[in-house]
Amino acid sequence: MVDFAFELRKVQDTGKLVMGAKKSIHYAKVGGAKMIIVAKNARPDIKEDIYYYAKLSGIPVYEFEGTSVELGTLLGRPHTVSALAVIDPGESRILALAGGKE
């Protein structure tokens, strides 16, 4: 089983990710993301856009079971993070969470 927190930190250290709903929606629209992670309590309109555009682009979406505050804390940020896009997973196995290609 893949440990989300561990793999997310690994992406931060060895790969590339972008934080924020607007940027995540952008990457869902144009492609370029390997995976998008959205917090369980993200606004419904944000979740709807992310799921819609990610489906069109063939990008897997993982819904984080915690809140945007908890997601921000996992990333070491002093603010909420409702969504993020994984551009390069680096050495992590985070793509396995959403059934993406590792």
Curated annotation (Swiss-Prot):
Sorted UniProt keywords? Ribonucleoprotein, Ribosomal protein
Q: Which terms in the GO cellular component ontology are assigned?
A: cytosolic large ribosomal subunit
GO term, biological process aspect, one: translation
Protein origin, superkingdom:
Archaea
Q: Which InterPro entries match?
A: Ribosomal_eL30 (IPR000231), Ribosomal_eL30-like (IPR039109), Ribosomal_eL30-like_sf (IPR029064), Ribosomal_eL30_CS (IPR022991), Ribosomal_eL8/eL30/eS12/Gad45 (IPR004038)
GO MF terms, alphabetically ordered:
RNA binding; structural constituent of ribosome
KW Ribosomal protein (keyword) present:
yes
Q: Which HAMAP family match?
A: Ribosomal_eL30
Q: Which family does it belong to?
A: Belongs to the eukaryotic ribosomal protein eL30 family.
* Protein name stated in the entry: Large ribosomal subunit protein eL30
Supply the source organism's classification. Archaea, Methanobacteriati, Methanobacteriota, Thermococci, Thermococcales
Gene that this polypeptide is encoded by: rpl30e
